Design a protein with these regions (language model features):
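Walker A/P-loop NTP-binding active-site region of P-loop NTPases
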Residues: 4-69, 116
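Flexible glycine-/small-residue-rich
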Residues: 9, 38, 87-90, 121, ...
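Residue-level signature of catalytic and energy-coupling elements of molecular machines
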Residues: 12, 63, 86, 120, ...
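Alpha-helical segments flanking ligand/cofactor-binding loops in enzyme cores
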Residues: 25, 107, 130-131
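P-loop/Walker-type NTP enzyme "switch/lid" segment
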Residues: 39-111, 221-222
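Amphipathic alpha-helical transducer elements in NTP-driven molecular machines
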Residues: 57, 71, 99, 103, ...
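Conserved catalytic-core segment of NTP-binding enzymes
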Residues: 111-112, 116, 122-208
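C-terminal lobe/tail of nucleotide-utilizing enzymes
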Residues: 167-271
């Protein structure tokens, strides 16, 4: 059975698209046929991070409005055989999205044998975000360890509990997972960032992963490659852990403790 997962947040710039790219790639690397869809109509960034921007001919809106079929619009990922990208439109208005059309796209992807559909949602509560979350079975709620980001995520949790198809039909609720990005244990210790416990006390949903703050994320984006492919880096390992936990594996949280200075660093006055 196909599962639809929305990657969402209340605030922009927290790493939703980075997460959508690496999470979908991680599922595909584990052998699952996966589609990742950009719902940010008018802006479109997912194709850049996936490195397929020059291969976009048709997009989600073209498919919804019958201007192209799904096979024409899906772009096969260059890294993973099981991964396909459906880009957003840069030229249409968000009102071009409608529930019936989105539902038909999901049904067709299910008929094509996709196990997972990852919806890269725009931030906030506009049309694209509502469409991305409406059909969701599960949600990755992405937040930074900052008060404003966490507060906005709380608002999104309220919408997942009231605006989705599952909520409207009185079905089992959307399964919510909390993903914390740009986490810097040193800044947490200094009191400049919220701790994991602070965030959980506010949002009260289970943490599926913690992604450390790193310049590697920008480097991967500039190269047009999901950061999960940056082998040997903390960020790549953290996203692999997220995928493993999502698939039911037990993995302890990593990269959540500040590095202690070595004996020699302390001896010679390093901090």
């Amino acid at each position: 059975m196909t599962k639809i997962i929305v990657v969402t947040s209340g605030k922009g710039g927290v790493g939703k698209t980075t997460t959508s790219a690496s999470f979908s790639a991680g599922l595909a690397l584990r052998g699952h046929k996966t589609a990742v869809i950009d719902f940010d109509v008018g802006l479109r960034n997912l194709d850049l991070i996936m490195g397929c921007e020059r291969r976009v001919v048709y997009d989600l809106i073209n498919v919804i409005h019958g201007e192209a079929n799904l096979n024409q619009a899906l772009i096969k990922d260059k890294h993973c055989d099981n991964l396909y990208v459906l880009a957003a439109s840069q030229t249409r208005d968000k009102d071009a999205l409608h529930q019936l059309g989105v539902g038909k796209v999901f049904k067709e992807l299910e008929n094509m044998g996709f196990e997972y559909i990852i919806c890269d949602s725009p931030a906030g509560i506009e049309t694209g975000a509502l469409m991305a979350m409406h059909f969701a079975d599960e949600a990755l709620v992405v937040t930074n360890p900052e008060v404003s980001s966490v507060r906005d995520s709380d608002r999104i949790l309220g919408m997942l509990g009231s605006k989705t198809r599952r909520a409207i039909e009185g079905a089992e609720p959307v399964k919510e997972h909390l993903l914390i990005t740009r986490y810097n244990p040193g800044r947490v210790e200094d009191g400049h960032m919220l701790s994991l416990q602070d965030i959980q006390d506010i949002l009260r949903i289970k943490i599926i992963g913690v992604i450390p703050e790193s310049d590697i994320v920008l480097q991967a984006s500039n190269q047009g490659s999901p950061v999960i492919h940056m082998e040997g880096t903390d960020v790549s390992e953290a996203y692999k852990d997220v995928v493993a936990r999502f698939l039911g594996e037990e993995k302890p949280l990593r990269f959540i403790e500040a590095e202690k200075p070595s004996f020699f660093k302390r001896l010679f006055g390093g901090r």
